[in-house]
Structures are given as C-alpha cells and as structure tokens.
Amino acid sequence: MKIKKQLIAILTLAVIAFISLSAAEFNLKYMIAEVIYGDKNSVESEILFSKKAGFYEEEFYLSIYAPSDEIYYTLDGSEPTKESMKYEGAILVSDASRNENTNSMRTDVCGSFLTDETLYQVPDYLVDKCTIIKAAYYDKEGNRSESEERAYFVDFEEKSGYDNINIISITTEPENLFGEEQGIYVLGNTFKEFAENNDLSASNYYRWGANYLNRGKEWEREAYIQVFDEEKTLVLSQSVGIRIQGGVSRGLLPKSLNIYARTEYGNNRMQYDFFDTGYYPQRVTLSSGGNDYYGKMLDRLGAELTEECEFCTMNYEPYALFLNGEYWGFYYLTEKYDEHYIEHYYDVAQENVIIIKNGNLEVGTEEDKEAYENMKNFVEYADMTVEQNYQMACTMLDMDSFIDYFAAEIYMSRQVDWPSANYALWRSREVSEKPYEDGKWRWMLFDVNTAALISDIDDHDTLAYVLQESKMFANLYTNAEFRETFSARLLEMADTIFEESRIVQMVSEYEELMGEPMENNHQRFFGTSNDVFYYRAKMIKDFAHTRKSYVETMLKVNAVD
C-alpha cells in the first residue's frame, strides 16, 4: 500500500512537473529518485524538495515542487511572502559558510558589549553555516500555503568539531529572536526602559533589564527544529515553541533555550526519543552550561555520577546548534522535570504528580502546596530528638532520597545558589501499591554548574554551610539515627560514586568528546582557544583527588556529642 501511494504521488508530480517545467529543467528519472528517497513526510506534503534535509559532501542544485508556479522562498528563517525571492528554477546549494556573517555579529545579545569587559567577542572569521530554505506558494486566489523548510549542510566533512555529536537547526522569524519589541535574545526595548530609569553602574550587566530576562508564555516564540543524530541522519522535523532558559545565565552567552512541543504547533510531544529511553518529552532544554560556560561539563558529570542514587537525574546529549543557519555553539540537550518525566520514569500517573521547585508549586493544586508547607514546617520545627517525630518525618519524606540528595550535593561542595535555591522535590498525591505512589517526597538534582566539583572549593566545609542554610537538614541532623545514616552514606559515596578514578575516567571521556566542539564554541563566543576548557577539566580531576580527605575531616568537625 505504501509503495502504491508513492507511485501515485510520483506520477502526479511527474504530470505537474511536465506541465510547469521546460524539457531542459525536467528530469523525470532524477525527480522520481528524489521523491522516493526524500524527507520522510515529503509524499504527504504539498511542497516537495528534490533533496532531503541533511549533510552533503558537494554542492548541488535544489528543485522545489508545488501545486502552483507561484513559489517564494527565503534563506534567513523568515516566512516567505510575495516580497521574498521567487522560485524561478533550481537553486544552487553550496557551503553557506563562505557567506558573510549576519546574526553572529550582533552586540545587542548581551550587556557585556556595553561595558569595558572583554569576555565576549564577535567572530573575526566566517563562522560555519548551513543553508536554510523555507518555501511557500500562492494559489490562484492569492492564498498562501503553509511553509516548508529544509536545512542543508554542505562540505562539513572537512570541518572539525562535529564528529560524534548531534546537530540541531532552529529557525524562526528573525524578529522573534532579535527584534527590539518581540526579540527574546536581545536587550531590546526592555533594556531601553531599564536604562532610562536605572544607573547601569549599580548592577552587573547580566542583571540589567532586558528582553532575554522576560519570562512566561508571552515570551515564547514559534520555531522549527531539525535534529540530526551523531551519524548526521535527520531524525526529527517539528514546529515547536522556544524560550530563553535560566537565571543569571540569561544575561550571558550563549543562552540556554527551552523547547516546547504543543498542540498549537502541531504536536504535544517531541516525535523523537532523544535519550534512547522510550521517553518522548513535551519539553527539553538546550543547555549552554549556565555558569560553567568555559567547561560545560559539570551538570552532566553531576547527573551521571549520581544516576543510581535515590533522586531524579537528567539525561544529557551533546549538540551543536545552528540558529537561523549560523553556528551558535556547543550545548547539552537535557530533559525537563515535569509530570510527564515522573510518569515515564517512576510509573506515577501524571495527574497524580506534585512538584515543588524553589518553594513554588510547579505541578499540582493549591491544596498540594499547602500539604508541602505542612510537611516543611513539621520537619523544620518538630523536635527530631524525639523518636516519634523522626519516624513521622520518615513517613513524609523518602529518607533515602533525602540523605542521598544532601550527601551528594555536600560531597560535590555545592554552595552559593544552593540549598536556598535550585532545589526541587516531588511526590504522588494519592497512594497505591506502586512503589513510588506512596505519598513521600523525593528530591531532584539539577543546576550543578555553580560552585561544585572544582579544586578551588575542595576544602569547603559544605556540611557546616548546609547546617546553616537548610533548616530542614539542620533539624533532622539533631537526630542520632539520621546523623549516623547520613555520615555512613557520605563516606560510602566517597569510595564508590565519587571515587577518584571513576571521576577521572568520566572527565577524560568528556574531554575526548568535547575537545574539538568546545574549540569551535570558544572561538565563536570568546575569540580564544579552548585551553580554559582543559584547565576546567583538570580542576575537576584535582577535586576528585583531594575532596575525600576533606569530607572525612568535615564529618569530624561537625560531629554532635
């Protein structure tokens, strides 16, 4: 049946082509081959491209077919109109990297360019580029069709930094990214208003009001993604929504992006198993590394070291981003914690999931938030030296999850923006026989890219710090059973999860994978080599060598008689 449909489509296209194209332009044999082996949705589409999106060793001519000869196309990600280029015949697609830089030369994407700081540089060379062709046609009544687009990467086998990583092309109307009014990636009008009413010297540039600091659905923009796996095979083409992601890192470069699948964009799930876990998420994050912008490995390392612990961790996959056709850096694509994540990995129905993040309700009802506050107040203020109170706390919390989470964060020397922020926990609302539908709160690890796992904080007394910063942990620590269990688990982690050779091996593997991609990233945004990347890797290895002895001392110093 599938073959029959393809043959019908081929014959139909042949007739259309015969009518609308001259004999010199029309090559039936060529067209049939390309329709059969074109994009997986090409037979169903009204607009057909003679080449599927992807990677090509040599330049080629691209033909576009539609039910009308009024076909228009763009090369900058914008929607085609009658003001765009009209398709008059096959288009030569060559290595777009030879074209002049456009958006990569912008200085309105970060406040740093308005200061004397020299952290970021616009590229003084031609950055790598792909060709984005977005086409639409007009019928006899003047109605415009939905647009179709393809990303073409030509001569990339000669370019370094793309082996063994995935590629994602994101395209959207340029105004969605860089417009003064609606652009989510620029200082924009929000900054103009901020500058008129504030002394810029009174705060760091990354805290200045700017479009990219704005949040919420109104600052989400429709975009189109094309994802290519490590073999450079197209695995996903989908309309999505994009937003800037992060806290302070919104004011840095490059910026992280949240990517949303929604019914309004055509599908409420990503149609690709990004992490080979059978999970088709609604949301993912393209993470720039946050404050770990020189190394970009701390979040992944923290998650992979602790993936067998009794708390949630994310999966990470390496990507190079091309934004409206231009190279835009190295990223890790990660999951987002939400009810769909919990349903998939913990077999808890999404409507039964409650998630609290940084003390705020992420998933659930106001009654659920009240239940969280009641638990929090009890654990923080009840006398935990009374055994009955401690046992009550154990019915509210998954104590193994709590201990694993705090032990891991403390061993990693997490501080500064934790535990007062960057924490999350979840539970089921209703109780059942399922192991994770027991109504107990469990913890979620994320954002380990600030003050963690590096040698200049290997001697930090993180236990004393947490005893001051977390009322919940401090109160539980007054209980002898809790202290004994926590201390034993922390020492066990030192010899297993955080054992030196294990960390060194992981970091060495990251260096092998990320070395060339990070060279591209550092040249693109900092105008430097990636020496600092390897230095960051060395700092992690040094931390692995020395941290254990400090942890042992830390437990002794904070012992309770």
Residue ranges and their predicted role:
Residues 3-214, 219-222, 227-229, 236-241, ...:
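Short, compositionally stereotyped local motifs that mark structural "simplifiers"
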Residues 125-129, 292-300, 397, 401-402:
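Short, conserved micro-motifs enriched in small and acidic residues
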Residues 69, 78, 98, 175, ...:
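Short, glycine-/Ser/Thr-/acidic-enriched flexible segments
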Residues 76, 287-291, 475:
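Short strand-loop junctions, especially beta-strand C-caps/beta-turns
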Residues 59-61, 88, 130-132, 149, ...:
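Extracellular structured ligand-interaction cores
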Residues 170, 194-369:
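Conserved ATP-binding subdomain of kinase catalytic cores across diverse folds
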Residues 173-190, 195, 199-201, 213-215, ...:
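Middle-to-C-terminal accessory/interaction subdomains
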